[in-house]
UniProtKB/Swiss-Prot annotation:
It comes from the Bacteria. It comes from Bacillus velezensis (strain DSM 23117 / BGSC 10A6 / LMG 26770 / FZB42). Pfam families: Ribosomal_S9 (PF00380). Keywords: Ribonucleoprotein, Ribosomal protein. The keyword Ribonucleoprotein applies. The keyword Transcription does not apply. Transmembrane segments: none annotated. This is Small ribosomal subunit protein uS9. InterPro entries: Ribosomal_Su5_D2-typ_SF, Ribosomal_uS9, Ribosomal_uS9_bac/plastid, Ribosomal_uS9_CS, Ribsml_uS5_D2-typ_fold_subgr. GO terms for biological process: translation.
Amino acid sequence: MAQVQYYGTGRRKSSVARVRLVPGEGRIVVNNREISEHIPSPALIEDIKQPLTLTETAGTYDVLVNVHGGGLSGQAGAIRHGIARALLEADPEYRATLKRAGLLTRDARMKERKKYGLKGARRAPQFSKR
């Protein structure tokens, strides 16, 4: 019989993560590499594992992730969002816990566009009185 799998798609900034939860011993694989190889920051790795620790499922699922776009912070946020959605598919009982922690909400903050006449989104050129 086919193995049980749960899917979740997470997004953050310009990153998109497709997450698959498979019953296992708790390995996290990102783009066919161990998580520590793909994301060097321990703080971001802890951030990614947050949905698993909150629902106490850290050692019960292997997490297989395909992620593209954005930088490390955006990718970490997208993976976290995807894991939360996949856990919800695995067991709808987790909704209250994940919702309270704010893990099911897509973070809508994006980079503000640069405006003409300015040096950045809001930074104005230096003002000279004389």
